[in-house]
Amino acid sequence: MEYFDMRKMSVNLWRNAAGETREICTFPPAKRDFYWRASIASIAANGEFSLFPGMERIVTLLEGGEMFLESADHFNHTLKPLQPFAFAADQVVKAKLTAGQMSMDFNIMTRLDVCKAKVRIAERTFTTFGSRGGVVFVINGAWQLGDKLLTTDQGACWFDGRHTLRLLQPQGKLLFSEINWLAGHSPDQVQ
């Protein structure tokens, strides 16, 4: 289990100067050719998403203005707050900030031939499904994960096991992404 606080994470500026990324985790850890990766991006200007052949990307708008996503003949989609949207990461996708204001989003990318991610928003106590990897990010409220208290802009990632997240207040929201491995693949094969 690895814990993080978005406010304390290192920031990598994009080459096109349109935004920045905070990498949460990758699997396998510290590998350039990852099977899955979670990150948070701040987008300050219109531009294109980086291409990642053979990957699927799920983007969830966390805050800021809505974002219009356009991919030639594939789709036109308005990204709304806390509504995950999946697309092939090898498609050219243009992002336009519809309100002209900076947006922040959660990204999870998975290698299509190895694993699949699901992203959802939780508003009550739950236990993970025993997936072989996952990430949680607190949008608001106070949550307990094991003996650790997580509050706004904090989270955790893990590479296996079942975990219970307890909401400690009457209300709270948390982004949860689980990783499931496709038949014939296992994280045990790469560690």
From Swiss-Prot:
Family indicated by similarity: Belongs to the Ves family.
Protein name: Protein Ves
UniProt-listed PANTHER family: PROTEIN VES
Highest rank taxon of the organism: Bacteria
CDD domains according to UniProt: cupin_HutD_N
InterPro entries for the chain: RmlC-like_jellyroll, RmlC_Cupin_sf, Uncharacterised_HutD/Ves, Uncharacterised_Ves
